[in-house]
Amino acid sequence: MDKSLVAAALSLAIAMSPIAAATAAELKVLAGGSMTASLKELGPRFEKTTGHKLDLTFAATPELIKMTTSAPFDLGVVPVDVMKNDAARATFAAGPMINVARVGYGVAVRSGAQKPDVSTPDALKQTLLKAQSITFLPESAAGAYVLKVFDRLGIGDAMKAKTKAQTAPGEIAKAVAAGDAELGVFLTNVLMAPGVELAGPFPGELQQELVFVGAVAAGSKDAPAAKAFLDFLTTPEAVGVFKAKGVTPG
């Protein structure tokens, strides 16, 4: 058996023990906004199993970087871009991070609307140019990549005029479902929401996966409990939830 799986199982077993239950922790968790659906389902399961309590805070990359250096926390499940910031990385314990999940990009339309062609770079370009309006979250790691794709397609300036910027991932699908924007352009798991349908993923030449990593904070008040939650995110139960939410585990 894989040694990492054995270690994860042992850590989780300790967290589930009567001794651990008697010393239940309250963990402050910082997480990428695009992990909201997955962690809101997995969090209560972990709490029920271990007795620990999770205080989940979801935010985009710029806000997460600020949060890591402004207040105590116990662990993060964050876009890897957060770890590229030296000040933010220094707030996490030394040692390897774990790859929790990854997700690609796509385009969504309102449910029932005709799905445009996004299968090739040129098709995606023409679809974006023809759209009356688009929406995404510019101030995020995922949004930064969307902007790069616009520039690669040579339509960066054209997109500025028709973009309706959102401040949280969940608002993207809501705007499309309400008819406030014709297209949603973002991570595919965020676009899997009521009232919207995925027109398709970005074509292979433009596709990239945003990786979410997990790590315990250097100042965690209960590092073993924090590590137990990260280990829980690698279990078959968690893997099943991630897949159901449109996220690729690991």
Which ranges hold each PLM region?
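Positively charged n-region of N-terminal signal peptides that target proteins for export
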Residues: M1-A7
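Bacterial N-terminal signal peptides
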Residues: A7-P18
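Exported/periplasmic ABC-transporter solute-binding proteins
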Residues: A22-R89, A93-G250
